[in-house]
Amino acid sequence: MDYNKAALALHSKYPGKIAVQSLAPCKNRDALSTAYTPGVAEPCRKIKANPDDVYTYTMKGRTVAVVTNGTAVLGLGNIGPEAGLPVMEGKCVLFKEFGGVDAVPICLNAKTKEEVIAAVKAIAPTFGGINLEDIRSPECFEIEAELERDLDIPVFHDDQHGTAIIVLAGVLNALKVVGKRIEDIKIVQNGPGAAGTAIIHMLQVAGAKHIIAVDEHGILVPGRPAGLEGHKAKLAEETNPEKISGSLAEAIKGADLFIGTSIAGALTPELAATMAPDAIVFAMANPTPEIMPDLAKTAGIRVIGTGRSDFPNQVNNVLAFPGIFKGALSVRARDINPAMKMAAAQAIAGLIPDDELNEENILPKAFDPRVADAVAAAVAQAARESGVARV
């Protein structure tokens, strides 16, 4: 199928992919006067007297803003807010189709992190949650951190945490397949940008102790000649316990797990062959992964996952974000905290019984109807237990 041609036809048909639907038909004078003035004044008075009533009388409690400034859209780069709108519309479709969550695309003409932060704070009263999307690194870290601190609704950068949650779910199941424990394995993360950094942090929360991060200049280690900036300096302190230096070739020797969020071909078969027996690879560069599955298998890799739907073990964020927001909204959560993210990963992993796990079946499929509800239930429970649920 020619997806480029089909996408142009789909997007131009209506045009766009989403629309506003009225839940209050206005077919007569009474209906009009109830939905709008004068009747609408009464919900306004209720909310003024008790601000939490906004969840009772408006769409806030079931609606998420999908926010971008178009600076890091898919593999297209900094294409701007208008060109990013089809992607944000698509994200809203996935929220609704997979999680039953209403979502609104917000594409900001905002060049700086301060402008993005100010804009999101200004629109936040309308929404029950904020999904940040396709904002370049390192600004994405700072934007999310300030919004999480200052807003009383969940803020979630899916490029970071959605990917990290799915990877952890896959890792937990892959380790069962190969008979290893996360505390014992050597992990190499190649490409510590937004997703890679979040993956490292999720793995650490799950118990990983030996992680080495590698970028285009080599292993992250304090004082390296190529230098370290921003979040990478912090990562260098938090990872690489033996403080080794060098290239990916040095890092990968004897590794049990490789996680790539980098570029096509970064993990050659020759490098993969130096990994430990029964090694696991998540090669998530798109559209061409760091190593193709057939080459990985030839090099001795036991389990391999990619970001592609045409190979087994697809790492697909749609397994996470619809259910995460569905669960967070259901309890009016103030945050999506580490406990909720961990609960989501464990719920996704748990959908595949141990007796069905194998080298090509470590993650549920994107269209598995159980996923969103399982994730939502786990996230809601974790929100209650961690004290961020309002109801």
Regions found by a protein language model. Give the residues of each.
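ADP-ribose/adenylate-binding Rossmann-like module
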Residues: 131-134, 257-311
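Glycine-rich phosphate/diphosphate-binding loop of Rossmann-like nucleotide-binding domains
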Residues: 74, 79-99, 157, 161, ...
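A short, aliphatic-rich alpha-helical micro-motif
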Residues: 124, 182, 251-252, 272-275
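General beta-strand structural signal in soluble alpha/beta enzymes
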Residues: 105, 131-134, 155-158, 189, ...
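N-terminal ligand-binding/catalytic initiation module
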Residues: 1-155, 376, 381-382, 386-390
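Short, acidic/small-residue loops that bind anionic groups at enzyme active sites
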Residues: 150-164, 281-286
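Adenosine-phosphate binding glycine-rich loop
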Residues: 158-159, 178-180, 283-391
